[in-house]
């Protein structure tokens, strides 16, 4: 009986601790682990480390976000990523950043970061930021026009978007609590997957005719 109580208590404690343990990237076990992006070793969480003698002296600094991206794109926006693939020094540290630039009327389409919470600051202009709650929170849209110097927060896994409502260019910088937050662009995922989602699945799910689905697929055949 005593053993059973101990086992139940132990399982309960594990359940309480599990969300905290799985909430972000694993904790690092050394000060620096500069990613060996050319390494052949298979990695599960993070990359293998370069010897510090080969890491150089610039792995703690980057100027990649200093320059605006080219917003002459179908979405009228440009994302400059600064994750572990672009900044190997972030390996095992559980952080990354992006810069997003917007032309007037440009958008960062509805998307999801499956592995990270996001916090951002608008650097220039005015952006409509929208966050979609899950079904159990009423599928509610939380939105606000966020101006230069103001911030926003997006919980991990929630769909969200940004749209430049101003008449001038806009930009924002966002940070993630993961070295590789991942991204799922909803329109591209639905209509540009490889191989494609069968049209009957989408016609039933979206309650539209097949010709509408085929039209949307043609828009995303070449990606974003």
UniProtKB/Swiss-Prot annotation:
Glycosylated residue positions: 70, 75
Sequence ranges assigned to domain Cupin type-1 in this UniProt record: 63-214
Induction section of the entry: By auxin, pathogens and heavy metal ions.
MF terms (GO), sorted A to Z: manganese ion binding; oxalate oxidase activity
Residues binding Mn(2+): 111, 113, 118, 160
Keyword Oxidoreductase carried by entry: yes
Cellular component, GO annotation: apoplast; cytoplasm
Subcellular location: Secreted, Extracellular space, Apoplast; Cytoplasm; Secreted, Cell wall
Enzyme Commission number(s) of this protein: 1.2.3.4
Keywords: Apoplast, Cell wall, Cytoplasm, Disulfide bond, Glycoprotein, Manganese, Metal-binding, Oxidoreductase, Secreted, Signal
Chemical reaction(s) catalysed: oxalate + O2 + 2 H(+) = H2O2 + 2 CO2
SS bond list: 33-49
Enzyme's top EC category: oxidoreductase
Pfam family, any one: Cupin_1
Function text: Produces developmental and stress-related release of hydrogen peroxide in the apoplast. May play an important role in several aspects of plant growth and defense mechanisms.
UniProt miscellaneous comment: Associated mostly with highly substituted forms of glucuronogalactoarabinoxylans.
Assembly with partners or alone: Oligomer (believed to be a pentamer but probably hexamer).
Name of this chain's protein: Oxalate oxidase GF-2.8
Organism of this sequence: Triticum aestivum
Organism lineage string: Eukaryota, Viridiplantae, Streptophyta, Embryophyta, Tracheophyta
């Amino acid at each position: 009986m005593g053993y059973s109580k101990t086992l139940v208590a132990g399982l309960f404690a594990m359940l309480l601790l599990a969300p905290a343990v799985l909430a972000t990237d694993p904790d690092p076990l050394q000060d620096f682990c500069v990613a060996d992006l050319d390494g052949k070793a298979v990695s599960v969480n993070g990359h293998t480390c370069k010897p510090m003698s080969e890491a150089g002296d610039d792995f703690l600094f980057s100027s990649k976000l200093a320059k605006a991206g080219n917003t002459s794109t179908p979405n009228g926006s440009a994302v400059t990523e600064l994750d572990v693939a672009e900044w190997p020094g972030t390996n095992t540290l559980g952080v990354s950043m992006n810069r997003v630039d917007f032309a007037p009327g440009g958008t960062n389409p509805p998307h999801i970061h499956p592995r990270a919470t996001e916090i951002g600051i608008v650097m220039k202009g005015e952006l409509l930021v929208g966050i979609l709650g899950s079904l159990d929170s009423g599928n509610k849209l939380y939105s606000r026009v966020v101006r230069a110097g103001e911030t926003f927060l997006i919980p991990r896994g929630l769909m969200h978007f940004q749209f430049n409502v101003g008449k001038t260019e806009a930009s924002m910088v966002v940070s993630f609590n993961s070295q590789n937050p991942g991204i799922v662009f909803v329109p591209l995922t639905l209509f540009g997957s490889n191989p494609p989602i069968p049209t009957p699945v989408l016609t039933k799910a979206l309650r539209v005719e097949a010709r509408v689905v085929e039209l949307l697929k043609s828009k995303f055949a070449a990606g974003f």
